[in-house]
């Protein structure tokens, strides 16, 4: 299964397009336990969605739980280090920057030292990035 999380109006073929309301294929509240079984998702696309979810640990743990071993997730967020991208939108509930993902990376300093204390179960391998989404102006 492939998930397009926070799809809004972008319905992709061959994906389960997920959002909090229509026109999504599946309506789901991602602040709750996710409705997919463990190890059932091969690929998840999360473009401009996870910053709208209040609990970063819950979000990353659920992504990890639903992915099959070797599954992939592609995440794009506005970086808090850039300021306006995150701060201007009142619907953003969590801040992310490039280093945020280290806390969910297998073998990282953050996972080794504190993961269990905070309930972090996700153990991703970052295979590309993180990179910052560029801010561009059209002239």
Which residues are covered by each model-predicted region?
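Conserved SAM-binding loop
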Residues: 2-82
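S-adenosyl-L-methionine-dependent methyltransferase catalytic module, highlighting the catalytic core
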Residues: 54-64, 68, 72-139
């Amino acid at each position: 299964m492939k998930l397009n999380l926070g799809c809004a109006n972008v319905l992709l073929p061959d994906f389960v397009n997920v959002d909090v309301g229509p026109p999504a294929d599946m309506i789901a509240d991602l602040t709750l336990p996710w409705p997919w079984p463990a190890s059932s998702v091969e690929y998840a696309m999360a473009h401009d969605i996870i910053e709208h979810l209040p609990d970063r640990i819950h979000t990353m743990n659920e992504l990890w739980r639903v992915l099959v071993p070797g599954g992939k997730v592609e995440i794009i967020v506005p970086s808090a280090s850039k300021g306006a991208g995150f701060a201007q939108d009142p619907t953003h509930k969590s801040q992310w920057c490039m280093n945020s993902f280290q806390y969910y990376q297998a073998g990282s300093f953050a996972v080794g030292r504190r993961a269990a204390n905070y309930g972090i179960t996700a153990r991703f391998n970052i295979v590309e990035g993180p990179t910052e989404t560029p801010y561009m102006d059209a002239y």
